[in-house]
Amino acid sequence: MKTDIEIAQSVELKPITEVVEKVGIGFDDLELYGKYKAKLSFDKINEVKDDKPGKLILVTAINPTPAGEGKSTMSIGLADALNKIGKKTMIALREPSLGPVMGIKGGAAGGGYAQVLPMEDINLHFTGDMHAITTANNALSALLDNHIHQGNALGIDQRRIIWKRVVDLNDRALRHVTVGLGGPLNGIPREDGFDITVASEIMAILCLATDINDLKERLANIVVAYRYDRTPVYVRDLEIEGALTLILKDAIKPNLVQTIYGTPALVHGGPFANIAHGCNSVLATSTALRLADYTVTEAGFGADLGAEKFLDIKTPNLPTTPDAVVIVATLRALKMHGGVAKTDLSEENVQAVRDGFSNLKRHVENIRKFGIPAVVAINEFVADTEAEIAALKELCSEIKVPVELASVWANGADGGIDLANTVVDVVENGNADYKRLYSDDDSLEEKITKIVTEIYGGKSVIFEKKAKNQLKQFAEFGWDKLPVCMAKTQYSFSDNQFLLGAPEGFDITIREFVPKTGAGFIVALTGDVMTMPGLPKAPAALKMDVTEDGTAVGLF
């Protein structure tokens, strides 16, 4: 079997101008980045913004193994299959972060015969969005430090600056740094740190903004620090929201590429799902909905993180609500949740599949709490056995959830036909009746408690002293009516990554909150979630290279 990059490089790409004709996008609607990549113009976005939206399909997953369960691959394969059965379909995905690409992932543009192309470009610098976000974030840091250096008219307490610098790499050495050293000419010394770019609030803002004016307003509302009297300092106080918007004026436009089968793909934005809301941009999803009859999109990690945030944070900003949710499951992940060691996941173990089904079952029940029908997609692997597949199908039948085996990695669109037909049946039955888990009027404590007890299956929430103090402070500032974005491990329903399956009776501990008032949500930190990842012992970068003719090697 060819590697992902070998498959990608064997495909004869069509000019992007030709690919997008099928959804009504013309040459003059594009800002080209070579032959195969483009940004969609605001003229076209505005032209279709009042059109009736099509059907929306959200792809999510069970709590994953470290390798992931193939949401992007399944999303791409499903979109290709929907097109193959005659449904005009677009896909809306997140952009990969270079840090994980060079670290553990090696690439994030799908896999096998379900990829978006050109995958080398998408995984590396693409159209420069990540660089623009990094630059805007760090320009804010520089302007903030300069304000303090030039007299600090706002009375900013340097001990209470909460804005960090970013870089789009995994670099643990930058988590905690000291800036301003070297004497008076080099600024005021203070503690600082770096996050990875996709953890930046500016990434979240870019993905929730509906136009340039909304982007500017959200940037103005970012809290960067506190004064000596403990009142918040916003970007608007520094009067720099215009400059930041200028840096992002092109990055806000969605990117257009294609799948192996020529499905138009909007790939735009990529906030982390365990520390941010984990969804591609509202602009990309909304525009796809108005251009196509079916739009397939995804939300990061398991349904307890990405899907909950998609439904509680992103959906209220969309022109329609999901008509179906596809939950990707693998037999290896179910066996892991059933107690099998990671080294033994390729061995047949029907009982472990049955034991691990509790994890998938809870995700199905959770999606139904939002009033949306679920479909289970079994992402097929070579090591899967007929007995294991039969057991999983039987268990799905018992809870009355449609289930289909999909082999899109190996067989592309053909491997997703059964799944596509089932999804269409569910969507056209029109049983979706979306409702949020909580209302804006609920307090932050009430919102978190609902997520913990109704989605995670936990017993209660413990707020540490710092978090309790912040709750009082945030209520005074009027931030308590914002949605909650939970930051926790993706591997478990709990805040303990080793508590697998569908645990009950546990407590979730909130150690502190991070206000993301520009993005419009409050992040609740649990456990030891890192905003700057480190590299593994053998990073994927060690296998990467480029040939004399410029061909990329080692991306996967």
Curated annotation (Swiss-Prot):
Q: Which organism is it from?
A: Streptococcus thermophilus (strain ATCC BAA-491 / LMD-9)
Q: Which PROSITE patterns match?
A: FTHFS_1 (PS00721), FTHFS_2 (PS00722)
Pathway linked to the protein? One-carbon metabolism; tetrahydrofolate interconversion
Q: What is the lineage of its organism?
A: Bacteria, Bacillati, Bacillota, Bacilli, Lactobacillales
Q: Which UniProt keywords apply?
A: ATP-binding, Ligase, Nucleotide-binding, One-carbon metabolism
Q: In the UniProt record, does the keyword Kinase occur? A: no
Task: Tell me a GO biological process for this protein.
Answer: tetrahydrofolate interconversion
Per the record, what are the reactions this protein catalyses? (6S)-5,6,7,8-tetrahydrofolate + formate + ATP = (6R)-10-formyltetrahydrofolate + ADP + phosphate
This one is known as Formate--tetrahydrofolate ligase
Q: Which family does it belong to?
A: Belongs to the formate--tetrahydrofolate ligase family.
Enzyme Commission code: 6.3.4.3
- Molecular function terms in GO for this entry? ATP binding; formate-tetrahydrofolate ligase activity
For ATP, which residues are the binding ones? 65-72
Q: Does the keyword Ligase apply?
A: yes
